[in-house]
């Protein structure tokens, strides 16, 4: 029983430490989600925690939304074979 508890705790820690992080990206344009208020940012935090993103925390860094605790399935900037195309 103790072994099972230790294994479960280790797997939890590995998942927490190795969680993905990066800039949120708009899949259709390939651009980062922009922001103006640097540091703690309610808009970035809300976007990062949205169901389709799945992050645990978001803030504004270098005028773009940076997310932590993202699942591997969430794309981050830069997208492969797609550059930011603002029109």
Curated annotation (Swiss-Prot):
S-S bridge residues: 31-84, 35-60, 44-65, 48-67
Major localisation: secreted
Tissue specificity note: Expressed by the venom gland.
UniProt keyword terms in alphabetical order: Disulfide bond, Ion channel impairing toxin, Neurotoxin, Secreted, Signal, Toxin, Voltage-gated sodium channel impairing toxin
Signal peptide: 1-19
Domain LCN-type CS-alpha/beta span(s) in chain numbering: 20-85
GO aspect biological process, one term: defense response
InterPro entries: LCN-type_CS_alpha_beta_dom, Scorpion_toxin-like, Scorpion_toxin-like_sf, Scorpion_toxinL, Scorpion_toxinL/defensin
Compartment(s) where it occurs, according to its Swiss-Prot or TrEMBL record: Secreted
Gene Ontology molecular functions: sodium channel inhibitor activity; toxin activity
Protein family per UniProt: Belongs to the long (4 C-C) scorpion toxin superfamily. Sodium channel inhibitor family. Beta subfamily.
Domain notes per entry: Has the structural arrangement of an alpha-helix connected to antiparallel beta-sheets by disulfide bonds (CS-alpha/beta).
Reported function: Beta toxins bind voltage-independently at site-4 of sodium channels (Nav) and shift the voltage of activation toward more negative potentials thereby affecting sodium channel activation and promoting spontaneous and repetitive firing. Induces immediate paralysis in crickets after injection, with a total paralysis occurring within 15-30 minutes and lasting for 1-2 hours. Is also lethal to vertebrate (chicks) when injected in very high dosages (more that 100 mg/kg).
Annotated protein name in UniProt: Toxin CsEv2
Native species: Centruroides sculpturatus (Arizona bark scorpion)
Lineage: Eukaryota, Metazoa, Ecdysozoa, Arthropoda, Chelicerata
């Amino acid at each position: 029983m103790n072994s099972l508890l230790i294994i479960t705790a280790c797997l939890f820690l590995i998942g927490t430490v190795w969680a993905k992080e990066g800039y949120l990206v708009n899949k259709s344009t390939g651009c980062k989600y922009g922001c103006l208020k640097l540091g703690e940012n309610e808009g970035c935090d809300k976007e990062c925690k949205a169901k389709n993103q799945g992050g645990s925390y978001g803030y504004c860094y270098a005028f773009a939304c940076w997310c932590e605790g993202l699942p591997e399935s969430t794309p981050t900037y830069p997208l492969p074979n797609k550059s930011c195309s603002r029109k």
